[in-house]
């Protein structure tokens, strides 16, 4: 009896233990499920909160990448203790490696941008990213930002072009991520030829070029695709935000900048001209830009091919953005910066990789090819600004010149007058000449009793070679001057046509005295109004192509 009782107690004890274990296991499953639900609710609340404070939520859309071990991919190339974090990539790799590939970044767009709507049938694009020995953390963050922050139907593929990196797996392992493809060069080709290779195999009708150390912002792609859909000859770029090379902070860039350059073909960011600012009432509207930075832009593939792709005889990197920008404008297209598109970029202070002929010689070769094909007689100013280019080899440009002729592209003079009139043509020793309209010439007419300098038109006396002193003018550095006195508009407002033009003592910093030539017009640089003759005075008026009173001849003393 005791034995039976002992066995019964043992059985009951085991049953109790098993029952307790089963209960706890089931409870744990339910708890995990409910935690997942609450987590989703928290994520939903977090995403709403982040949207309110204009931060992109850290949410990965779609299914996880099958077969891609993100942790293993990143840990294989992390810095060793004591290594210089800047040495290999010219940015702080240690800080980059600390960050999640899916990190949230701030929405830096203008508050009006979220209310802009776009077509529901925007074309899909092939995103082309070229790289050479890029840090795995920045490369992966670039790829994942595109996938996480772009509607899936707009990304046909992401083509990674590995420009002969030391480790092929930097690229190959990423093909385990959906939509990512990898092309590997069997020798170092450089960004330019690598991009052409990526474009040639791209399946989409629209190409999007990205650098390999970027993070795209929310709704970055639809605004650019919309502009290209409306006009396939547009080449569009986002506002390029700054990712700190030191701590990888994401910093908003100004929305009032466009691309510019000097005669040495050195790219610079510059303020939008004042007259354009004054007419911009909608901050979401595109900004015309003379050149693009070149690292990030969207272009129709057929237009890219029609224009001749890139100049494949250019080496590695540098200068290709000028060549493409001149070609787009002069051959019938346009360049825009779209304010509602934002992409962050790590700007480095040095190149982390080697150029076969050195950085300086490579840049000279590339920009010299640009100058010889596209700058016509103005290439002399390139050589004056960059004398080290004189005599340097740059290869044959015969096929590029022939292609320009076949496309019936406009002149560089047209580009300066219609696209980039702010680029001043250098004047070494500006000699006096006359400013003529019909048989009359612009002349100073002494002073009145109040001491004001008088200005008017009079019958031309003498010649351009030997003008009368009152009709001899010097037009240089945006000033129209005579013996220390300069033409000045009395108003710089575009809304004030008919304002008199007077003579006053020259002040190179005075905006009222700034003028530029635009074809046969003399245009006030600030107001955008044109110099016009009236019966009793000279005024600034709205420029009109058929206004004879606004047509001028500037005949230099030669």
From Swiss-Prot:
Catalytic activity: L-seryl-[protein] + UDP-N-acetyl-alpha-D-galactosamine = a 3-O-[N-acetyl-alpha-D-galactosaminyl]-L-seryl-[protein] + UDP + H(+); L-threonyl-[protein] + UDP-N-acetyl-alpha-D-galactosamine = a 3-O-[N-acetyl-alpha-D-galactosaminyl]-L-threonyl-[protein] + UDP + H(+)
Domain Ricin B-type lectin: 428-555
Stretches of the chain found on the membrane's Lumenal side: 27-558
GO biological process: protein O-linked glycosylation; protein O-linked glycosylation via serine; protein O-linked glycosylation via threonine
InterPro entries assigned: GalNAc-T (IPR045885), Glyco_trans_2-like (IPR001173), Nucleotide-diphossugar_trans (IPR029044), Ricin_B-like_lectins (IPR035992), Ricin_B_lectin (IPR000772)
Mode of membrane association: Single-pass type II membrane protein
Enzyme class, first EC level, given as a word: transferase
Extent of Basic and acidic residues compositional bias: 45-54
A Pfam family: Ricin_B_lectin
Domain of life: Eukaryota
Gene Ontology molecular-function annotations: carbohydrate binding; metal ion binding; polypeptide N-acetylgalactosaminyltransferase activity
Membrane topology, Cytoplasmic segments: 1-6
Pathway named in the protein's UniProt entry: Protein modification; protein glycosylation
Name of the protein this chain belongs to: Polypeptide N-acetylgalactosaminyltransferase 16
Lineage, highest ranks first: Eukaryota, Metazoa, Chordata, Craniata, Vertebrata
Originating gene: GALNT16
């Amino acid at each position: 009896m005791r034995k039976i009782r002992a066995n019964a107690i043992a059985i009951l004890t085991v049953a109790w233990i098993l029952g307790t274990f089963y209960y706890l296991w089931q409870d744990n499953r339910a708890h995990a499920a409910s935690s997942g639900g609450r987590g989703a609710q928290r994520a939903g609340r977090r995403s709403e909160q982040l949207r309110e404070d204009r931060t992109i939520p850290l949410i990965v859309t779609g299914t996880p990448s099958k077969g891609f071990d993100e942790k293993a991919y990143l840990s294989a190339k992390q810095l060793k203790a004591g290594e210089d974090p800047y040495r290999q990539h010219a940015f702080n790799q240690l800080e980059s490696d600390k960050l999640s590939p899916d990190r949230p970044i701030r929405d830096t767009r203008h508050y009006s941008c979220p209310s802009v709507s776009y077509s529901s049938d925007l074309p899909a694009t092939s995103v082309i990213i070229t790289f050479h020995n890029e840090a795995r953390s920045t490369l992966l963050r670039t790829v994942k930002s595109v996938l996480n922050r772009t509607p899936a139907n707009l990304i046909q593929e992401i083509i990674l072009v590995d420009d002969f990196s030391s480790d092929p797996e930097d690229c190959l392992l990423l093909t385990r991520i959906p939509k990512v493809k990898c092309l590997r060069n069997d020798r170092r080709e450089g960004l330019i030829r690598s991009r052409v290779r990526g474009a040639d195999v791209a399946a989409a009708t629209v190409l999007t070029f990205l650098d390999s150390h970027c993070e795209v912002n929310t709704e970055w792609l639809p605004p650019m695709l919309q502009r290209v859909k409306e006009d396939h000859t547009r080449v569009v770029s986002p506002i390029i935000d700054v990712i700190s090379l030191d701590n990888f902070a994401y910093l908003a860039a100004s929305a009032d900048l466009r691309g510019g350059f000097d005669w040495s073909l050195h790219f610079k960011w510059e303020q939008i001209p004042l007259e354009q600012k004054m007419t911009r009432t909608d901050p979401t509207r595109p900004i015309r830009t003379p050149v693009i930075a070149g690292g990030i832009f969207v272009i129709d593939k057929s237009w890219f091919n029609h224009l001749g792709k890139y100049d494949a005889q250019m080496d590695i990197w540098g200068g290709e953005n000028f060549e493409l920008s001149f070609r787009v404008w002069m051959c019938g297209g346009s360049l825009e910066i779209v304010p509602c598109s934002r992409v962050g970029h790590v700007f480095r202070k040095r190149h982390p990789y080697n150029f076969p002929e050195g950085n300086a010689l490579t840049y000279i070769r590339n920009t010299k090819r640009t100058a010889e094909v596209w700058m016509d007689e103005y290439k002399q100013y390139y050589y004056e600004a960059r004398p080290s280019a004189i005599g340097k080899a740059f290869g044959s440009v015969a096929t590029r010149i022939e292609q320009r002729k076949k496309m019936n592209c406009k002149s560089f003079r047209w580009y300066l007058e219609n696209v980039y009139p702010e680029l001043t043509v250098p004047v070494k020793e500006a000699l006096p000449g006359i400013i003529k309209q019909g048989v009359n010439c612009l002349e100073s007419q002494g002073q009145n009793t109040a001491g004001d300098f008088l200005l008017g038109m009079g019958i031309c006396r003498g010649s351009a070679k030997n003008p009368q002193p009152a009709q001899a003018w010097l037009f240089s550095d945006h000033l129209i001057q005579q013996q220390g006195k300069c033409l000045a508009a009395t108003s710089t407002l575009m809304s004030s046509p008919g304002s008199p033009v007077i003579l006053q003592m020259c002040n190179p910093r005075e905006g009222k005295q700034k003028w530029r030539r635009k074809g046969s017009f003399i245009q006030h640089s600030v107001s955008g109004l044109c110099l016009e003759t009236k019966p009793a005075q000279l005024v600034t008026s709205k420029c009109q192509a058929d206004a004879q009173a606004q047509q001028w001849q500037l005949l230099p003393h030669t």
